[in-house]
Amino acid sequence: MGGHLFLFRDGEIKMSIITQMVLPFSAGVAGNWYHTLTNSSTVNVNALLKDSSSKLCPIIHWNAIWHHRIATEIATQIFDGLRVQEDLVQKYRKKYLRMFSTLPLKSNKSFSYYVGACSLDAITKNYDKTNLERLQSITEELSCDGCFIEGTHYSIYCTETIGRAFSLLDQFYGQDEVWILIKERIGFVTKWQRRVSNTEGVVASIGDSWYEEVKPIDEEGVYEYLDMTIHRISKWVIIQNHRKSKFALHEHPHLDEVLIAYGDKWIVQGSGMPSYKQVMANPLKWRRPRNHFISEGVYDIPWLWRLRKKENRSRSVVTNENVIRIIDSGYKTIRWPIDDGVRYIATSTKVQWVYNGCKFTCSGEIDAIQEDFAYQSVRYREEKKIRVVRIQGKNLQTSVEPCL
């Protein structure tokens, strides 16, 4: 019961769709529809709404984000001048509002559902305060203090989703105090995204994520959030994680991990994920806490690592223009990446090695050195295996400086 679709083109009388007889569009088919709507003028939206609105508004769907984005896109295109039969849009809105929206869970999926709902409210001039208030509640929880609790990729998904409909929503809701709160929160998230990016705008891989870009920002300072402290000095961006927020979808065991960028290059970017397909094929591989450059603990097991989130912070960062230092207090086993084919130079008080164009030097009372590995997403559907050096000792200090 597969799905094929024939797009309406200029000169044709009708768009025909052969789809599943019972099930709604799959995530893949819905995704194709969304991208077709955004990139082509060949889709007859009247015919789409008439022939397949039940397929576009599934009552239950495991991952309905593309259906949400289709609703937002249709409303926005109408706002931009597309002519559609008003009764079809009204019927579509009513069906959409009956769609399962991952309630009561507040997540990127429920966020995009309510962006779609508010967009349809706006384009049909139905001032439903309930939808707007629910969107504000979800936005407040996800955005926290600006540091998006589901990580960089899903923060970009949410800001792009609401950004597409921003002019429509802003014109309709205007000075509504709830809408003003939503705009303020989205502004905080956008600023955070830029603060966790390097000089080219490539963001850190926080949570389920991969190589993505935002508009770079030219600012220096130390920015304290509940879940991390961001240090921006000269060409350095250092993200000192200290995750405290409660459970969130797509959360990773960053714990006390330190992420490092120098100029346009990420030295330690974060594990992320290459794609759902690859993660689900090897869940233990991609949910392995020691894919991250954390100080090790007894609960470094998939899903149990959250028991470590309440640990006291015993890691600090010192920055200057040329060298940064990561200071680990007490007795620990720490992890850092090392280039393939490179030997580390070790004594009882110092270990030196090179990774990604930077020289690492770890000093302190060193008891043991071992090797391990980690996995990292590079771009969407791309991954690499990273060689790791594990250093066990007391009061360890790691300096990082660019190679000449």
Model regions and ranges:
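Aromatic-lined, polymer-binding surfaces characteristic
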Residues: 1-186
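Short, acidic/polar N-cap/turn motifs at the starts of alpha helices
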Residues: 4, 226-230, 257, 290, ...
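Beta-sheet entry/capping signal
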Residues: 17, 23, 32, 228, ...
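Catalytic micro-motifs at enzyme active sites that drive phosphoryl/nucleotidyl and oxygen chemistry
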Residues: 58-62, 246-248, 280
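Short, conserved secondary-structure transition motifs
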Residues: 63-69, 102, 190-198, 346-359, ...
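Carbohydrate-active enzyme catalytic cores, enriched for enzymes
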Residues: 113-118, 153-267, 374, 385-395
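Catalytic Cys-His active-site segments of thiol-dependent hydrolases/isopeptidases
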Residues: 268-272
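CBM-like, beta-strand-rich accessory domains located in the C-terminal region of large
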Residues: 274, 278-404
